[in-house]
C-alpha cells in the first residue's frame, strides 16, 4: 500500500484526494486529505466535541486549549506528522497488512434486495436515485424494483451533497482534551450487529510522554487506534458494559474496583494480556460466540449473494473478499505486542492509560523533522531528547482523594493527593456475584501462536483493487453526536496514621536549599519547610560528618566529595539483607519499609517481614471470595445402563468436572491478580517514585555544591571539565537508581507470588476438599442405586470416578512467574543490555562488514584494508599494515568519576615489540585509559585529570597465541581487575584515581605490528571472576554447534529440522510441477510426509559440526536426496545426486546459540511468506542474518 505524501494543507481541492466535506449530522465543513484508499486525514480539531469546557467538566490529567491546531502551521505539522506515522506503520510487513485490512474492511453494504436480505431506508436521496454505473448495472439485472440496489455506508459527503467519497476511517486532531486519543463509531447498531460502520480517530501526534525511561512511540499510539477501528468496521464492538475487574483500589476505604474495557484490554498487550492468556476461562460472556455468529452470517451472505454476482463491482467484491479472509478471532488476537516487535518499539508493560494513577504524565513536543522518521525515533526511544511542552502548565490536577494527615490535636500536618486511574470504578464485588458456568461452552481461548493474525491479507491483491469512485449512499449511516460531560469530584479524608502517600510526599520539595532528615514526624511537624524526609542513612551521616570541614574550593576536593556522595547513595539505595528463603525470597530490600511506612514497628523491617510474611506488606488482606459454583447431579436416567455404557457416561462427567475444577482454580488465580497483586504493583510504583525522589534530592545537593564551587577561583577549562564530570555522575546516579528499582520489582513480585502460594492456594485446596467430598458422596450413592451392574462393577466405578486431591492440584509456579517476563520486558532488556559495544565482523559479498550489535548504535570508522580471518570462534580483525585503525564513537564511552566499565577481547600478537606502541584506548590530553604494547608485554594504564596514574604490566602474552583479555574497572570498590584467559592476574586499588573524563571515542590502532582482535566488547558494569571464567570457556566451547538438546551436533546422524518461528512443525517434502521442495505443513488435508535430515561432512576427519563448516545436507525419505537451490524461484529443491548438491555453510546465531543458520554464497536459508498452503524453504538474498524465519533448530 502506498501512502500519499504529496500533500499539504494548501493542496488545491480536486474532489479526489483533497475534498471539502460535511461533518456528519452537522453543518460543519472541513478539508480532508486522502492518504490511502478509504483512509482520510482532517487536520482540524474534532468537530464532535466542544472546545470550550467548563472547569467542573475538565478531567484530571487533561489539557484543554481551544486555540490548539487553529493556525495553518499547526495544521500542516499535524498533517505531515500523520503521514510520517502512517509511512512508519506501512514500512513493516505487519503494519502494511494492518493498513491494507483497514483500507478494504468496508462495512457491509445495505439493501441488496436481489440477495434476499433486508434493505431498510433504501430510497434516501429524492424520488429518483442519481445516475450511477453500479446502480444502472443493477437495474438491468433481475431485481424486482426499478431502483433496487445496494447502498454504502462508508462515505463522506461534499457540502452540496453532490459528491460522495469512500471512507473507512478519518483521522482528526484532538477533541476537547488535546492529550486524549479516541476512536468513535459512526453508527452504534452497525458497530455491534456485524454490519460494520466507519470510524473517526481523534488523535494527538504532536505531543508524547514518557513511561519509565522511554518515550512513547506515537506510531504505537496510532496503531492502537487503528486496531480499535477494526472492531467498528467489522461490527464486533462489545457492549460498553463488557468490562473486567482490573485492580482493587487500596486508597479507598470501601472495597472498590477499577474496571477495564474489553477492547482496551485486548489491544494493549503486555503483562495484562500475558495473564489473560494463561487462563482459558477468563471470558465467559456471550459477546464472543455471538460476534462469531454475526461474522459468519455476513460472510455467508457475501459468499452466496455477492462473490459471484456480476452486477456488483469489483471495487466492492474484492474488498469484501479481503475483509472476510480475516476471522473475528484474528481481530481479537491483534495487540500491540505484535507491532512493538516488528516496529522495534518499546511499549508500557501494562495498560498505559491506567498507569496515570502511579505516574503523572508530562508531555514532550514531537519534532518529526529532526527526531523522527519512518524507522521511529532517530536516536531511539531512550536516547532521544525532546523538549518539554509548554502545555504542561495547563495539565488539570483533580485528585480522586486528598489525604489530610493530622496530629493528636487534629492540626493538619500535610495534605497528599491520590489520583485516579482514569478507569470506570465500581463498588460491586465482581467475584461475589460471578457464577462459574458449568454447562455453557462459550469460554473464549486466545491464540498463543506466534503467527501474525493478519498473514492471510494479500498486500499485492489489496493494491490491485480499484478504488471506490461511484457511491450509492445510504443516508442513515450515522448516529447523532452526543457529547457526554463527566464530572469528577475530589474527596478529602482525615487520618492520624501516616500513609505511604504521605511518606512519599515528604520526600519531595520544590526548594533548592534543604536539609535531609530521617525523622518523618519532625519533617511534617516542623515549621521549617526546608526539612525533607530521606532514608539514605549513610549519605546523611557522611554529610553531617563533613559539614564543619573547610570549603570545597578545588577540583580535587570536589571530586573526592562527589565520589563519596555517589558511593554512599549507591550503598543506601541498593542495601539488601539476605534471609532464610521464604517462598523463593532470600533477599529483602532494607530501605523499603522506611521509605513508605511499611511494617514500621519496634522491630526491624526484616524481623517484621519474617514474622508476618509477605502478605503483611499490603493493606487489604481479606479479599478472597469463595466462588459461586453450579454442578449438575448425575441424571437418574443413567441408572439402568450397562456397565460399559455407564462407565462411558461417568467418564464424560468425571472429565467435565476436572475441567470445571480448573475453572475454579483460575477464579482464585484471577482474584489474586486483581485484588492482591494489584496492591503489590502499587507498592512497586510508589517505591520507584520514592527512589526517583531521593535521586532528585541528591542531584540537587550536588548541583548546589557545584554552584558554590563555580564561585571559587578555578580556571574555566577546569570548571568545564568538572561540569561534564558531574553530568556523567548524574547518569551514574540514575543507573544506580535503576538497579534499585529492579531489586524492588523483583522483591515485590516474588512477595506477591508468595501470597498466592502460601495464602490463596491453600484456601483453594481446602475449598475443593470440602467441595469434592460432597460430590463423592453423591457419586457413591448414585452408583449404589444403579440396577444393571453387580457389586464388583460398582466398586470399580466408585474407585474410578470419585475424586482425590491429585485431581485438582493445578499450581504451576513457573507460569505465574512468567507473568513478569513478558515479551515487552524482553525487548527492554535487549535495548538496556550492559553492552556498550559488541563488535561483530563478517564477510559481505563486496566488502567486509564490521558493526556494533549491542543495540547502542555505535558509529564505526575503519581502514578498508583491514582483513578478516577466521580466529578463535569466528571472523577476527587482522590489522597487519602500519596505522590501520578502527574508531568507535558513542556517548556511552565517555568516562567520568563514578562509572564502571569493562573491556574484553581476544588478542593474538605476532611479532616482537620493545617500544611503547598503543593498541586500544580512550584517552585525550593525557587523561583516560589505554592498553599498549611495551617490552614484549601488554600494559593497561589509567590516568585522571589531576595526573594520578595506575599502570599494570602483563608479560608473557606476545608469543603468537590467542589470549582472552578482560579488564574491569569498579569505581564503587575502587578496584581494577585484569584477567588473562581464565586467570586473575591483577587486583589493584585505584582509590586515588579521580575523573578520567576524556572522549566518546575508543580507538583500536596498529602501528607496525601484526595483530588479531576478536569479540571486542565494552560493558557498563564491572565483571567478576566467575563471569570471566564462564565467558572464556563458553566462547571456546561455542565453536561447536549444538542441537536442540544442547548436545554436540554430529555429522552423519539423523535429525528433525524445525524453523524458529514454527518450533513444533517440522519440514516435509512437497512435490510441485514434478520437482521436490521443502515446506511446512499448513493444511491437514494435504498428504505430505515428514522427512529426516543428515549433515554429511566434506572433511571426513570431522565428527562434530563447527561454526563455518561447509557440508552437504541429505534428506531421508525412503531414499536419500540432497539439498540444492532452484534457479527459478530460489526454493530449496531436492536432487538425487550428491554431485549436484550445494555445499552449505553452517553457523549459529549470536543471540540464540541453540539456533542454526544455513547459507550459500552469503545468502541465507529461510522460510518464505505464506504461499497458499505452504511456507517454502528458500535461499534469501539478504546478506545479514535477521531473526525469526532465518533460524533453524535440529532435534535428534
From Swiss-Prot:
Region (N-heavy chain nHN): 409-828
Superkingdom in the source lineage: Viruses
One CC-aspect GO term: extracellular region
GO biological process annotation, one example: proteolysis
Main localization (coarse): secreted
Family of the protein in this entry: Belongs to the botulism non-toxic nonhemagglutinin family.
Protein's organism: Clostridium botulinum C phage (Clostridium botulinum C bacteriophage)
Annotated spans, C-heavy chain nHC: 829-1195
Stated name of the protein: Non-toxic nonhemagglutinin type C
Subcellular location: Secreted
Miscellaneous note of the record: This protein can also be encoded on a prophage.
InterPro entries assigned to the protein according to its UniProt record, in alphabetical order: Bot/tetX_LC, Clostridium_toxin_transloc, ConA-like_dom_sf, Nontoxic_nonhemagglutn_C, Toxin_rcpt-bd_N
